[in-house]
Amino acid sequence: MKKFIALLLAAVLTLALAACGSKNDTNTNDNSNDTNNDNAPAAVTGTVATDGSTSMEKVIGALSESFMANNADTTVTYNPTGSGAGITAVQEGTCDIGLSSRALKDEEKAAGLKETVLAYDGIAIIVHPDNPVSDLTIQQIAQLYTGEITNWKDVGGNDAEVVLIGREAASGTRDGFESITGTKEKCQYRQELTSTGDVITAVSQNPDAIGYASLASIKDSVKALNVDGVTPSEATVKDGSYKVQRPFVLATVEGKALTPVAQAFFDYATSPDAAAIIAKAGAVAAN
């Protein structure tokens, strides 16, 4: 009997100790979970598909590289189809974020699209480096593109016919240029090209050509003209003194949630942390 009581007491003591140990273990796990939830958000993974403006290539490229460097299991793709095609792509759900180098039109907003201004970019008026012209007024630019002025000598240049280079009808850069210069549906283009790079290349190969392109994409192979006496630069775009400028827009579908990884990229791109990267790419961050 004494042996049985001794064994019973030993069993009770063992169970009590086990219960205490189990309670302590549970508390430890709860604290660990709380710590993880508060201080270590889940890492995002997957692919973000962007589509649209060729003018936004440098800005989106720089933001994508930075985002992927900080999020190892992510990929950001960029399809340089032009602003109009990018807007269509996001409407049709073939990309996460549409890229437009113009503000969305009222009918696009009415169709359910939302614009978020990422940055502002100058539209540079470009000529061949050998062209002696260095400054044009907005009025002169309009007169050149509508065919009212057809010879460079009439604006201080050589005695040569002006060759007008522009973008295709769906281009956001073209929309911005024609809106600012008041030349919508009036331009007498010799060539209508499908990308910023193509315009720069065409102008760089023709001493008599004039074109327009994203300031963020300008290369030494062409010369950017002053407009109304103002040099196109990040500073003059920012202070508004350079008038030929437009927004870089992220287009999304109103009321439709982005995937977690697309939302993370969107939040990063529009945050103050991205401003320096956008500036390095040649544009002025909206934040």
Spans of features found by a protein language model:
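Positively charged n-region of N-terminal signal peptides that target proteins for export
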Residues: 1-4, 8-9
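Exported/periplasmic ABC-transporter solute-binding proteins
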Residues: 4, 21-30, 34-287
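C-terminal motif of bacterial Sec signal peptides marking the signal peptidase cleavage site
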Residues: 15-19
